[in-house]
Amino acid sequence: MGARNSVLRGKKADELEKIRLRPSGKKKYRLKHIVWAANELDKFGLAESLLESKEGCQKILTVLDPLVPTGSENLKSLFNTVCVIWCLHAEEKVKDTEEAKKLVQRHLGAETGTAEKMPSTSRPTAPPSGRGRNFPVQQTGGGNYIHVPLSPRTLNAWVKLVEDKKFGAEVVPGFQALSEGCTPYDINQMLNCVGDHQAAMQIIREIINDEAADWDAQHPIPGPLPAGQLRDPRGSDIAGTTSTVEEQIQWMYRPQNPVPVGNIYRRWIQIGLQKCVRMYNPTNILDVKQGPKEPFQSYVDRFYKSLRAEQTDPAVKNWMTQTLLIQNANPDCKLVLKGLGMNPTLEEMLTACQGVGGPGQKARLMAEALKEALTPPPIPFAAAQQRKVIRCWNCGKEGHSARQCRAPRRQGCWKCGKTGHVMAKCPERQAGFLGMGPWGKKPRNFPVAQAPPGLIPTAPPADPAVDLLERYMQQGREQREQRERPYKEVTEDLLHLEQGKAPHREATEDLLHLNSLFGKDQ
């Protein structure tokens, strides 16, 4: 750590903290960026001590500069950091990383005076046509075309692509890029370099034979040709089995009616490679679904990888992208994606689902679940008003019932303390709405006004009609008793006569005579 801190000291370290990472950004360089750059130098076999001087930084830049155009983000960040350190050692005032890069490229270009130290964006690139110096067919100064064999580097890249991807969806565009401008002879060399996967090679050979037969059927032989005239290619000529390299070049670049046999052969092989891709990748795009804990970005990568292997119309692929991508997402991401509206872009979907399925969302879901589990259910207002504190009838304490009480059992009634009855039948129970009940006592829940002693009530006297009515009622009761009495006595005497006893009254026969009913005139 001490050696890394010695890269910049004193004033240079203060100047480093004033340089911005981006022209319009707020973040600035810190010593941790120097430590990171020292760690990255080990990956390129460069010593950390080179950062301590201007010449050492210049050597690092010489090594990294050719790799910047095709390098990764870490490589570009390392190049930018070394540019800033070079400016500090050279005592050049810069405000941000872009100024440091321009200053370094200008100084290095002035010192070397070659195009190798020019800015990466201004370097000449290879021509896009098939006539560059890296392609098999090249044109000489006299206008003639010559054949240059494929370099071992190209063949090695093709073999490594097949071995690493194992006929994945990347093999087809890889073959298309490596075989650009090649003749059928060169393409056969590439196919012969594949040692393994002979089943896939046999599928490609069958596709080539079928396409060659179709070519022969569509292009019949016109007839005998004059001597010295180049014949038209047959299917086997396009496949490179019955033609030479010189004939293939002449067919490709003749002025009249050229036949691009190389591109035709490439197209046949691409059809075979696409069938091999479907065979080695049987996963259907309809089966690509996002897992419950899978990040949305990983699911999108798998989806587009399977979509790339699908050999369908672009309109069908567009429909799959708009429909299946959202339909096969997990419920969490699907809920977020439906809130984006109709036909959201892929950038909007990736941004919206960036945190779904991550540790942050898992923590929030767990916190919500725990909150719901630990929160007691709400008590209704009426139940809360009616809720009372439980009191024990045995010991008189609150918080438990008599059944749960641990104190000794109390004898007698728990209400009044007397023996002989239980609390449910206690005569001293609490008065109801109408009083204490039918026990011969006056109700004690109504206030009674006590008249002070020495005062005479001033209420009016009773109504005389009430007394008169009571007297009439009493007389009526007496008359009814008198009318019922003779019949009762006669009935009792007859019962005594039947039993052979003497009657209680001597006038029984008189009472039984009709004179008792109709008088003495009968």
Curated annotation (Swiss-Prot):
Residues 108-146 are annotated as: Disordered. Residues 8-43 are annotated as: Interaction with host CALM1. Residues 220-227 are annotated as: PPIA/CYPA-binding loop. Gag-Pol polyprotein: Specific enzymatic cleavages by the viral protease yield mature proteins. Signal peptide: none annotated. The keyword Magnesium does not apply. Residues 7-31 are annotated as: Interaction with Gp41. GO terms for molecular function: RNA binding; structural molecule activity; zinc ion binding. The modification Phosphoserine is found at residue 151. A motif (Nuclear localization signal) lies at residues 26-32. Residues 12-19 are annotated as: Interaction with host AP3D1. A motif (Nuclear export signal) lies at residues 16-22. SUPFAM superfamilies: Retroviral matrix proteins (SSF47836), Retrovirus capsid dimerization domain-like (SSF47353), Retrovirus capsid protein, N-terminal core domain (SSF47943), Retrovirus zinc finger-like domains (SSF57756). The keyword Membrane applies. GO terms for cellular component: host cell nucleus; host cell plasma membrane; host multivesicular body; membrane; viral nucleocapsid; virion membrane. GO terms for biological process: viral budding via host ESCRT complex; viral translational frameshifting. Residues 73-77 are annotated as: Interaction with membrane phosphatidylinositol 4,5-bisphosphate. Pfam families: Gag_p17, Gag_p24, Gag_p24_C, zf-CCHC. InterPro entries: Gag_p24_C (IPR045345), Lentvrl_matrix_N (IPR000071), Matrix_HIV/RSV_N (IPR012344), Primate_lentivir_Gag_pol-like (IPR050195), Retrov_capsid_C (IPR008916), Retrov_capsid_N (IPR008919), Retrovr_matrix (IPR010999), Znf_CCHC (IPR001878). Residues 280-366 are annotated as: Dimerization/Multimerization of capsid protein p24. Keywords: AIDS, Capsid protein, Host cell membrane, Host cytoplasm, Host endosome, Host membrane, Host nucleus, Host-virus interaction, Lipoprotein, Membrane, Metal-binding, Myristate, Phosphoprotein, Repeat, RNA-binding, Viral budding, Viral budding via the host ESCRT complexes, Viral nucleoprotein, Viral release from host cell, Virion, Zinc, Zinc-finger. Residues 14-33 are annotated as: Interaction with membrane phosphatidylinositol 4,5-bisphosphate and RNA. PANTHER family: ENDOGENOUS RETROVIRUS GROUP K MEMBER 24 GAG POLYPROTEIN-RELATED, PTHR40389:SF4. Belongs to the primate lentivirus group gag polyprotein family. Late-budding domains (L domains) are short sequence motifs essential for viral particle budding. They recruit proteins of the host ESCRT machinery (Endosomal Sorting Complex Required for Transport) or ESCRT-associated proteins. p6-gag contains one L domains: a PTAP/PSAP motif, which interacts with the UEV domain of TSG101. This is Gag polyprotein.
